[in-house]
Amino acid sequence: MARSNVAKTLLNKQHAPFRSLNRRGDKFLFSIKSGLLALSQLGVFRPGKSFLAMMIILMVGLGLPATPAKASKYASIVIEEATGKVLFSRNADNLRYPASLTKIMTLYLLFEDIEAGRMTLKSRIPVSKKAAGRSPSKLYLKPGQSISAEQAIYALVTKSANDVATAIAEKLSGTERKFAKRMTRKAKALGMRRTVFMNASGLPNRRQKSTARDMAVLAVAMRRDFPQFYKYFSTQSFNWKGRKYGNHNKLLAKYSGTDGIKTGYINASGFNLVATVERNGVRLIGVVFGGKTSRSRDRHMMQILDNQFKRVKTITVRRAALAMPTTLPVAPPERGDKLPKSLPVSKTKTRPAAAPKKTEF
């Protein structure tokens, strides 16, 4: 199928619900008009004062939410990092609010500037009045204060500090608006096709959206491009001005093999999480959007990762069995001998890519 035809097919599928909505809407609008005319004749409906009520009635009748709806279903994906194979997905391409998962991209660009020599871990990041005024979660920095780049990294990874995220944006691009445009450009360059960033923190903005699949792409890019900085994502606590801040990612402490990466929450998004876990030489990346609570989100993440680790182990054992030579006799172990539980896995270090590479799943 030609590329243009594929695009048309995808657009038709995406817009089909809206066409049916419009058909239902035509009938509903006719009945609403009739009803409002009758109410006005009875003196119940007054166009000037009842406009808001009328709009709410219309939206309910058309099946539209009066306010941005909270995610009612999980959007999740699990991939095997080494192969890029999608092992599990559910609503992985649905647009969702990323919340503080946004800060993963903020950190990606900070690491990019440090690696390029435009900053160092000791560089000071000034705090503006706008940055200091950001709503929690925050470090409650004051205008005129500054924080080192390394302290800023810890603050985003653990406390998920919105004031620090805005300060980073202003340091790197002059304004947060310019930084958000840079974030979106980088997202497209990495292969995050449906992601748009509007700020550096993930604070509510109706135009700031992403998908579970896109966030998996970002997690892969972060580990691939900045392995030297990835250790920060396993930080479980951070001390600032005599106070200790714990990492919101509880999987670091309670789920074996977890070494990253970031949580996120706003009311409209539910509880989100990107996690990377390595066991027996196999690394999986999981993304979950839309948990009702942080605990239910964590349980869901652990469940889908458990299932896929079992699946990968089964496939690996099956492949190993098929690859075993069948012409040579294999003696059974002597009584009392024990076979090793696992064999050592050699790991090769790869140099980070000079330019961003697109990742597709």
Residue ranges and their predicted role:
Residues 22, 32, 40, 45, ...:
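Generic detector of intrinsically disordered, low-complexity, polar/charged segments
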Residues 1-75, 79-82, 87, 118-120, ...:
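N-terminal secretory targeting signals
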Residues 21-22, 37, 50, 54, ...:
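Alpha-helical protein-protein interaction elements
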Residues 2, 59-213, 220-223:
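Active-site-adjacent loops and short helices of periplasmic peptidoglycan-processing enzymes
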Residues 192-196, 204-361:
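Domain-terminus/edge residues, biased toward the C-terminal soluble/receptor-binding domains
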